[in-house]
Curated annotation (Swiss-Prot):
Part of the ribosomal stalk of the 50S ribosomal subunit. Interacts with L10 and the large rRNA to form the base of the stalk. L10 forms an elongated spine to which L12 dimers bind in a sequential fashion forming a multimeric L10(L12)X complex. It holds the Pfam family Ribosomal_L11. This is Large ribosomal subunit protein uL11. It comes from Brucella canis (strain ATCC 23365 / NCTC 10854 / RM-666). Keywords: Methylation, Ribonucleoprotein, Ribosomal protein, RNA-binding, rRNA-binding.
Amino acid sequence: MAKKVAGQLKLQVPAGAANPSPPIGPALGQRGINIMEFCKAFNAASQEMEKGSPIPVLITYYQDKSFTFVMKTPPVTYFLKKAANLKSGSKTPGKASAGTITRDKVRAIAEAKMKDLNAADVEAAMRMIEGSARSMGLEVVG
């Protein structure tokens, strides 16, 4: 018989750095999820990823207190800031430029994010990422 789903929880956890301290511990604990079990499973699953990169994770927890989780790729903004060597985007996008990024880098980001984006092809994914770049105050060149 199938397990009864009690709910879902979305978190953004640094790769390889899940620990029971806030905000992860309280978010899991109040839903009755075994915190240490999640931390061990997540850290093992995110070993191959770049240490410290923010990983969106969707946790489905069941009434019997068990859980499953699905890891996504890091957010587009993380990739854009990394590609443009920025700490943060522009405070006034459209007026002040935070930096530039080439179309080649946009294509690389689109290919990395393709499985998580709702895009038919790489060109559509590139347009989405260029929109995110403009929202951050980045200029797409090339």
